[in-house]
From Swiss-Prot:
High-level lineage: Bacteria, Pseudomonadati, Spirochaetota, Spirochaetia, Spirochaetales
Name of the protein this chain belongs to: Large ribosomal subunit protein bL35
Key words, A-Z: Ribonucleoprotein, Ribosomal protein
InterPro entries (alphabetical): Ribosomal_bL35, Ribosomal_bL35-like, Ribosomal_bL35_CS, Ribosomal_bL35_sf
Family recorded in the similarity comment: Belongs to the bacterial ribosomal protein bL35 family.
HAMAP family with a match to the protein in the record: Ribosomal_bL35
Source organism (scientific name): Borrelia turicatae (strain 91E135)
Gene: rpmI
Keyword Cytoplasm tagged: no
Length: 65
């Protein structure tokens, strides 16, 4: 049987924590920042955790992670 392939885009977007949770970088922090409040920009700067119902789907994309 052949090896399972890793989805390269998912590999670049997601990272696993030591406890097994999946974290990602939030969107909307690249450009057009003047109209966004400092509170919103500060919250977007922190990494987010993937919700529990999406974890199974992401783990199928990353079989060796």
């Amino acid at each position: 049987m052949s090896k399972m392939k890793t989805c390269k885009s998912a590999k670049k977007r997601y990272a696993f924590t030591s406890k097994g949770k999946i974290k990602y970088k939030k969107q909307n922090l690249r450009h057009i920042l003047t109209k966004k409040s400092s509170k919103r920009r500060r919250k977007l700067g922190k990494s987010g955790l993937v919700s529990s119902f999406e974890v199974k789907r992401i783990k199928t994309l990353l079989p060796y992670a």
